[in-house]
């Protein structure tokens, strides 16, 4: 499989159907839980630690599913969905680098929210800086992440961990 450096929505949906990395390997969730529309850049080099970087975007639209229910008359994207997108991207990175197994979020260090995504926003950008990729019995990625809305940073998460598992029976 040839590695691409960017992915469009249809390619991300293909990953969600298990077609991109093969059966039993890393998959993205399908909508509505897929929290980005495109990966604009992915590389095993670069980033703040020289271990890789992922950049992705979500187009904000007033009719996104969560605005209707979170909250009544006070629509805001749930912070946990932005955090989940960061884990989704690290899992994608692990599959993209050839890691076997299904992705599972394993934890986070410090998470900070200092802004919000409102229906009036235009674009969310996620930036993940990989700190470490372990390619042993457990295939695991650790990264620091930032979420920007219309160019302003509003979330950060340190030491996000995602593992790939070939068997999740005892997980």
Curated annotation (Swiss-Prot):
One of its GO terms (molecular function) is trans-2-decenoyl-acyl-carrier-protein isomerase activity. It is found in: Cytoplasm. Its main location: cytoplasm. The active site is at residue 70. GO terms for biological process: unsaturated fatty acid biosynthetic process. Its EC number is 4.2.1.59, 5.3.3.14. Pfam families: FabA. Keywords: Cytoplasm, Fatty acid biosynthesis, Fatty acid metabolism, Isomerase, Lipid biosynthesis, Lipid metabolism, Lyase. Homodimer. NCBIfam families: fabA (TIGR01749), PRK05174.1 (NF003509). HAMAP family: FabA. Belongs to the thioester dehydratase family. FabA subfamily. This is 3-hydroxydecanoyl-[acyl-carrier-protein] dehydratase. It comes from Hydrogenovibrio crunogenus (strain DSM 25203 / XCL-2) (Thiomicrospira crunogena).
